[in-house]
Amino acid sequence: MGRQGLIHIVILQYKLGGIYPMKAVDIRQMYLEFFKEKGHHHEPSAPLVPINDPSLLWINSGVATLKPYFDGRVIPDNPRITNAQKSIRTNDIENVGKTARHHTFFEMLGNFSIGDYFKKEAIHYAWEFLTDKKWMGFDPELLSITIHPEDQEAYDVWHQEIGIPEERLIRLEGNFWDIGEGPSGPNSEIFYDRGVEYGSDENDPEMYPGGENERYLEIWNLVFSQFNHNPDGTYTPLPKQNIDTGMGLERIVSVVQNVPTNFDTDLFMPIIEKIEEFANRKYKRPSEVDLNEIFGSEEDINTPFKVIADHIRTVAFAIGDGALPSNEGRGYVLRRLLRRAVRYAKQIGIEKPFMFELVPTVGKIMEDFYPEVTEKCEFIQRVIKNEEIRFHETLDGGLAIFNEVAESQKAAGHDFIPGADAFRLYDTYGFPIELTEEYAEEVGMKVDHEGFETAMEEQRERARAARQDVDSMQVQNEVLANLTVASEFVGFDTLVANTEIAAMIVNGQVEKVASEGQEALVILAKTPFYAEMGGQIADSGIISNDSFTAVVKDVQKAPNGQPLHTVIVESGEMHVEDAVQAIVHRDDRNLIIKNHTATHIMQRALKDVLGDHVNQAGSYVGPDRLRFDFSHFGQVTKEELQQIERIVNEKVWDDIEVVIEEMAIDQAKAKGAMALFGEKYGDVVRVVSIGDYSIELCGGIHVKRSSEIGFFKIVSEGGIGAGTRRIEAVTGKVAYEVVKEEEALLNDAAALLKANPKDIVTKVQALQGDYKELQRDNEALSQKIANAHSWGNCRCSTNNWRCHSSFYKSRSKDNNLLRQMMDDLKALMPKAVIVLGAVDGDLSDAMCRGITIINRWQLPCWKYREIWCQKLVVVIGGVRPDMAMAGAKDASKLDEALLSVYDYVKSI
């Protein structure tokens, strides 16, 4: 049996007596099940918007969410991890739709070892999954391997243990994974031979696994993380070697379903079929297209369908995970993707908003593993539809910019559109270079392609530099990672603990003693101090005995989970194994727990008032206030804030019991517990219930009953970024003090207005009415004075060559009055040069108008303004063919400026 026949048998399964290609959902599940059988913990996919990682714009790989494990900041419960992680990358956006496999949204299947197994096991696992008939069942002869030239260990495993012949083991210098500081190492890539129909030219220097060709498709990358890339550029062996692998789901599905591109798989085709309902033509199926047409680098007849299908997946999932379109950051990425998709939609006859109607299809394809798009479908659709409508306006604005640039270039004697402007139209307004070329051709111009490519490459360089900066992991800290002494947190029940010092780090090294004035990191055998987590700040307090006193400045979680106290030794010497007393500051703790419980109630109230799309985007819970960042598309009205505040206070006054329980994660979810979006949880979780109103997974500390909060007061609310808003509030004593401060301000205002506090609004409204009436009287009087002076001055006009010239200076402060005077004088003298000057303190303003001279000679108004400006240090104002304005700070030369225009009129 030939290779092609074997491939078809491998990728087909039997179902109800029929044969069908394995679906993407089956392949994803099969991968995860395989590694769970190998003892791996399945880590759920994190949201695309990074949580607690400001270095990343998007989650862009399977390993991105595991960085704390790889750099040693956190020790996982199970060192073997597997995941299917949704990811976004937009560095090659211009290639999406033109190639078979470029995407902005994709899924990465991965298996990871944090200091457990290494190369041998990773290679054997990969080979078993790909070739065993129980799993993928690929023909081993269709698989080739690339390795780093110096990675003899990997070569020996592949060649001697797996049995890969030398001709299918290719050594490549590029097989080394390194993104800057942090873990790095060689890698092995596995390639699948798709057959001679995808390439058979023996003279093609790129026709080999790892070359630029379509025949040999990379399906899996195994990274052997064995070095630390240090800040000084050197490499040292990692304390613990790691495994990081990645298999693109879209790629492996295209192989299994035997289709030429990722877009022809069941991950994309339902979306493409939905697009066809709106388009004026159909997508060309693989049987209708020659492979040479598919695998070019240029656009083909299917490009618009591919672009739209890819981009709607990205945008729908990103919005579902909390991102919103904007002009900056990740919001700008979404806006750019939507613009690009809508622009391509026009090529297939779609002229109206339609992208939002694709969202249910995206959700349906992915809902078995990613239910969030379906769950938030209505909200996602609303956001996308609004953005589509706005884009059509943006497109018109881009055309206006093009016209301005074209006119400016022609006026300067040029016949081309500068590359920088063409790139601005491309990058900001979504104009493809081809569209700009078409517009340029219509007005007899060309486009500076070299300048455009230069600007494009500069952007790519900035993106590459940014990726190198944001992807790097921290260098592993071996000292902290090796601290495995036990520490028990007892702070849920007490603020004081008699304990002992279990371990100590001074100046980055494990020590036995810390002296007066030194800072140390301390682990206690048991501690009442809460380590900062979930927005709740760390406790402060004292650790002491008869020999020393140390102030606790901060408490964080060590890599192995123990509370790690940062302390300053104020007096004496602190020794490991000292018996000590640890005391938390009671007043601060009491204020913190009131704010924490209030935050839970407020989050539920936000969802009730604004909608279930509200998700936590950040928080701070301290003794002074609570701060809560949340996702929301639009403003929060005054009435909504009042409603939220009222709901929280009602729950406070209801004196609800706060119940804290530990239970299985599935039980908590069944109970309706709200989880922090994107947070990782173990099999057993802590559930905080405030009656049946608020149920959340939370490891923080809370009041016993809601009435202990006392009083809740919102002090501010506003936007802090695209689609993200922030509420700050206070509780208890602090809330009372805020109210008293506002009351004092109200009383001061009432005293100034000579009114009772309850009558302030009425008093201010009356004053505003009086002020508006005075304004109207003042404007009417000013107009009368100006008119009187105007008519008087007109009788002193100069007649020169049948052209009247009128000059006038007043003390009007209002440009509108000058314009009104100009209109009146224009009606009186239709063939006149009129110059008006107004003085306001040390400022002067002028308006001039040029009209027909000798019935056939028309002078533009800017010429008169030019004469005027020669006499004054001016700030140029607006200009029209029949009117111009200018302003100056020195009013002393106003008379001279007026006369200079008069002299010019006489001279012509």
UniProtKB/Swiss-Prot annotation:
Keyword Acyltransferase included in the entry's annotation: no
Example GO biological process: alanyl-tRNA aminoacylation
Co-factor remark: Binds 1 zinc ion per subunit.
A single Gene Ontology CC term: cytosol
Cofactor(s) of this protein: Zn(2+)
InterPro entries: aa-tRNA-synth_II/BPL/LPL (IPR045864), Ala-tRNA-lgiase_IIc (IPR002318), Ala-tRNA-ligase_IIc_anticod-bd (IPR018162), Ala-tRNA-synth_IIc_core (IPR018165), Ala-tRNA-synth_IIc_N (IPR018164), Ala-tRNA_ligase (IPR050058), Ala_tRNA_ligase_euk/bac (IPR023033), Thr/Ala-tRNA-synth_IIc_edit (IPR018163)
Positions bound to Zn(2+): 596, 600, 698, 702
PANTHER family xrefs: ALANINE--TRNA LIGASE, CYTOPLASMIC (PTHR11777:SF9), ALANYL-TRNA SYNTHETASE (PTHR11777)
Name of the protein this chain belongs to: Alanine--tRNA ligase
Gene assigned in the entry: alaS
